[in-house]
């Protein structure tokens, strides 16, 4: 297929980008900075989807500029008839210009964020593009979207491709420091979704040198294996379904584990559709029909089995759904949800027919999966009965807050916060030291439940979790409603030792599995009590890590250091109410960590590794991360 200037279609100019960058890249924070890289990489991926590129290299240079190099056809350099300038300059200086807007050039495009590489150019203090094409090497440079050179021929080349180097504009962005892990996560994702494309990322910044390369022949199947590699799997290999209809290409990978949570990832043209859409609705419909038919036709006894639902069949399932579609219609600027209505029926049919074939080829494994679904249905019924039992209690009983909760006076959830505190003694100090208007205290006691190894019916009736569920007031699991949340800050306060770390992890696992919106909406925090109290010249100083402590000690004259009194806190109970308030609870001076999910796949893997049944992955994880541990209780 030819790719020349006439394939470049212009929609409108570039004037507004620098004035309102947030409209085009979401924000001028580090997320917007990363968005620039994704835009350039998306152009290379479009070439790969069209069958002309199989290698993409990303380099973070020592000066915080970024280079993206591919072996595609190279951006055309001939003159565009309507515009009277080279196609290369057109693509880099006009908003919404590019081959992806012309159906004849790319049937499927992933880089259609409503922006394109011209926005990267507009928001860069410097950009250079080198094109290898037609036996020649072309180069043009820009500053803040304005050409600073002509399209010059700088040599000959037997290769082909496009190399873009840009330095984001410090006048626009809050930071120019890229996060290697965030970029590599997205590039790994792209390599899974587009098998047999080799994508590498290199960090050349001083002290941060790193290199990663991603190449997966298995594509979606390899993606599913990657997500589930620390889980106890029911299948040896992921099931794979693919098909196409009316230019819609559907690929689905499925694998069941022995766990209780399901994990469904969906993509349209390589874009993560976090809110789902018609393709996910089609998947669920086709999946439910096929699994219901498999159960109906199986030899498994149907006696006393509740009616099996989608959730029952999904228990322990990891699925990756990827579709390629010529003209996706996304709802919202974030591309969070696919809206093309005709896609649902196509995906439903392909998944239904493909899954039935897979089932016929794997009857023994499928019997294990169906029996798992039956156990899930029985647990669901038990959970329903437990909820009904709670509802049948008097209104006073069912709404009663736990007796150990010391609530606060404010009625406004936005200004209310709850400290979930390990131990009665620390809870007592916290109750005495708190701000009674806005701070509630809920002490924990006894052994916490590991929800990773427990079905929902056991979770919602657990005597250690019921006080937390009741205090927060928003329900749990499938009946969790964040608008009912009684506190907008949920602060986990535990000792700075191994037991405290374990309690924090158990609570975070519970929130992640049964109240994930708490984390997604920024409501969960970890309190950071000090590790040391240092007394010197009748003044007390608190330090939260060894670096702070050593820096302070280093500032004291050598001869006076014997006058320093140093205490290392092992537990919260060692502090009196005033000290606990001053160091850990006073909003003006305290330190807290906000819990965020930057990488949902990695979070899933870590919770399964740390809290699941399999010991070996947990041992490996601890060995690999032991060097990163700052305070280790032995």
UniProtKB/Swiss-Prot annotation:
One of its GO terms (molecular function) is DNA topoisomerase type II (double strand cut, ATP-hydrolyzing) activity. Residues 416-530 form the Toprim domain. Mg(2+) 2 binds at residues 495, 497. The record marks 447, 450 as: Interaction with DNA. Mg(2+) 1 binds at residues 422, 495. Transmembrane segments: none annotated. Its EC number is 5.6.2.2. It catalyses: ATP-dependent breakage, passage and rejoining of double-stranded DNA. Heterotetramer, composed of two GyrA and two GyrB chains. In the heterotetramer, GyrA contains the active site tyrosine that forms a transient covalent intermediate with DNA, while GyrB binds cofactors and catalyzes ATP hydrolysis. A type II topoisomerase that negatively supercoils closed circular double-stranded (ds) DNA in an ATP-dependent manner to modulate DNA topology and maintain chromosomes in an underwound state. Negative supercoiling favors strand separation, and DNA replication, transcription, recombination and repair, all of which involve strand separation. Also able to catalyze the interconversion of other topological isomers of dsDNA rings, including catenanes and knotted rings. Type II topoisomerases break and join 2 DNA strands simultaneously in an ATP-dependent manner. PANTHER family: DNA GYRASE SUBUNIT B, MITOCHONDRIAL, DNA GYRASE/TOPOISOMERASE SUBUNIT B. This is DNA gyrase subunit B. It comes from Borrelia hermsii. The gene is gyrB.
């Amino acid at each position: 297929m030819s790719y020349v200037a006439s394939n470049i279609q212009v929609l409108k100019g570039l004037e507004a980008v620098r004035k309102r960058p947030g409209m085009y890249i979401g924000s001028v924070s580090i997320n917007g900075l990363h968005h620039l890289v994704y835009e350039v990489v998306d152009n290379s991926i479009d070439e790969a989807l069209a069958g002309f590129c199989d290698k993409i290299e990303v380099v973070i240079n020592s000066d915080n500029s970024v280079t993206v190099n591919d072996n595609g056809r190279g951006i055309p350099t001939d003159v565009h008839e309507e515009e009277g300038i080279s196609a290369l300059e057109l693509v880099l200086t006009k908003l919404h210009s590019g081959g992806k807007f012309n159906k004849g050039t790319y049937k499927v495009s992933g880089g259609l964020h409503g922006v394109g590489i011209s926005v990267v150019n507009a928001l860069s203090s410097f950009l250079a593009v080198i094109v290898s094409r037609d036996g020649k090497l072309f180069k043009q440079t820009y500053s803040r979207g304005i050409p600073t050179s002509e399209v010059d021929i700088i040599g000959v080349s037997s290769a082909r491709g496009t190399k873009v180097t840009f330095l984001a504009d410090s006048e626009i962005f809050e930071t120019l420091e890229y996060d290697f892990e965030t970029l590599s996560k997205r590039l790994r994702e792209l390599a899974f979704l587009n098998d047999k494309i080799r994508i590498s990322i290199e960090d050349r910044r001083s002290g941060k040198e790193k290199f990663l390369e991603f190449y997966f022949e298995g594509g979606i199947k390899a993606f599913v294996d990657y997500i589930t590699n620390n889980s106890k799997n029911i299948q040896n290999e992921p099931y794979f379904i693919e098909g196409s209809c009316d230019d819609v290409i559907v690929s689905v990978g499925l694998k069941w584990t022995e766990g209780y949570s399901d994990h469904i990832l969906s993509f349209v043209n390589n874009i993560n559709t976090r809110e789902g859409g018609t393709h996910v609705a089609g998947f669920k419909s086709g999946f439910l029909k096929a699994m219901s038919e498999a159960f109906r036709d199986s030899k498994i006894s149907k006696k006393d089995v509740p009616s099996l639902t989608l959730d029952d069949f999904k228990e322990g399932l990891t699925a990756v759904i990827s579709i390629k579609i010529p003209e996706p219609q996304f709802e919202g600027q974030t591309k969070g949800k696919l809206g093309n209505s005709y896609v649902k029926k196509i995906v439903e049919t392909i998944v239904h027919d493909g899954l039935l074939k897979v089932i016929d080829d794997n009857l023994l494994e499928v019997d294990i999966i169906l029996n798992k679904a039956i156990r899930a249905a029985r647990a669901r019924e038990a959970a329903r009965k437990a909820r009904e039992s709670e509802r049948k209690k008097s209104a006073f009983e069912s709404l009663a807050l736990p007796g150990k909760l010391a609530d606060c006076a404010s009625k406004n959830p936005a200004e209310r916060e709850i400290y979930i505190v390990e131990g009665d003694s620390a809870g007592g100090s916290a109750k005495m030291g708190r701000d009674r208007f806005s701070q509630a205290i809920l002490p924990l006691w006894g052994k916490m439940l590991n929800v990773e190894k427990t079905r929902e019916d056991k979770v919602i009736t657990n005597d250690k979790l019921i006080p937390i569920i009741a205090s927060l007031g928003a329900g749990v699991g499938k009946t969790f409603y964040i608008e009912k949340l009684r506190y907008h800050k949920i602060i986990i306060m535990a000792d700075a030792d191994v037991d405290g770390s374990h309690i924090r992890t158990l609570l975070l696992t519970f929130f992640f599995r049964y109240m994930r919106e708490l984390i997604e909406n920024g409501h969960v925090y970890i309190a950071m009590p000090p590790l040391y109290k240092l007394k010197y010249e009748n003044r007390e100083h608190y330090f939260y890590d060894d670096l702070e402590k050593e820096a302070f000690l280093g500032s004291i004259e050598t001869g006076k250091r014997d006058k320093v009194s140093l205490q290392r806190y092992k537990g919260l109970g060692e502090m009196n109410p005033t000290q606990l308030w001053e160091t850990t609870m006073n909003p003006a001076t305290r330190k807290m960590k906000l819990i965020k999910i930057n990488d949902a796949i990695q979070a899933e893997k870590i919770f399964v590794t740390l809290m699941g049944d399999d010991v070996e992955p947990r041992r490996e994880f601890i060995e690999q991360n032991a060097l990163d541990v700052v305070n280790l209780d032995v």
